[in-house]
């Protein structure tokens, strides 16, 4: 959320403390069970921090018991980042709206800002209920629709949380007027524009496959629920382009697909499909450490039918008195390819593009189409302190220097060993030590995981290899267990 004034961190902390009292679900960490991941309530105080990291940086680090969200601030901006295992877009926006409301009431007591309930009063149990299981029925038939493989975006991807971020602001009224002139909703209109923008970047020899977008669906619109946990599904909307295809053709197809796939019976079939696998007794009996690899393989297989993602969170509403203090709301999502997220407040709709591929051609195509449709827009300049190119270059330079030092130490040890003893026996130990140090640092940098755990596993593996070396060579000089 971008405010009309600089953020006061102390007041923001007070607002966060108030908000946490109403949303106990967020007072949880993600734990590994024997068969599934699960959320565990922890008495950890959520602390407001100044923004330093890139947007959508990793919040969940295995083996570290930390909350699955972070509230930060930078200049006039309040950020709320959340891990998707905790809640979905609707839950996140409800939390942020409550946080912003609490902050503005505390920051401007003389303004007498009205209090509005963002969600109905609920019990902690209702907030944490599993709505998927509540509405699951084994009597609902399977959706047997076969999904064709879609076009995939290609290109070298950025490392870690780094993403190409583009923020575009468009007027709601003019966009709605244009969409209605075509007889469609804003979501259908923007979906068709994104499909066309992607199509322009696909080579001719790859245009036989459809371009498909995953569109998240808020299941609370179909099945009443007070849950603040994940309760969303998705539909896949695509189009196979031909040489004679025009924008109106894509619009008409997308409109019909939305109408067909958002039918309540089909939504229920899809929702049941998400839960059916989890309810399978064979799947439930497989240990998590084995199951997670099949889950990753299944996710990769499922993504074959998707080119990109478009998520429209919808409208954020506040009383008229708040307009003097709120500029706009925006949303970004982490992605392995390309994702567009949108939300609106007042007459401003913010389009947040995130891309793992450092090429903004699709975003430029989209903005060109906005001009062609006579929709004014403003591209916001990125102002994220953790996204500076200088920071990335310094990290890479440090890593390259460390790699050179490891090689240099290994070579020097080899030279000394040969000059003094005319053998290389001890050189291999020095080289192995340098290789271990290099591996620990690189795994820590590229995987961003628990360094101590990586070191422990590495030590265990090396010890086993040493024992095997001694056993099969008969040298009995490598492993200390034999001395």
Write out the residue ranges for each language-model feature:
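Gly/Ser/Thr-rich phosphate-binding loops and adjoining beta-strand/alpha-helix segments
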Residues: 1-10, 65-78, 153-220
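Acyl-thioester-dependent acyl-group transfer interface
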Residues: 1-36, 43-70, 199-382
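Non-catalytic, low-complexity flexible loops and terminal extensions
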Residues: 77, 86-94, 98-177, 370-382
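N-terminal membrane topogenic signal
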Residues: 391-405
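Hydrophobic transmembrane alpha-helices and their membrane-interface boundaries in multi-pass
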Residues: 402-475
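Conserved small/polar residues in nucleotide/adenosyl-binding loops
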Residues: 482-483
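Short, Lys/Arg-rich, polar N-terminal cytosolic tail immediately upstream
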Residues: 382-394
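Histidine-centered acyl-transfer/condensation active-site motif
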Residues: 2, 62-105, 118-122, 128, ...
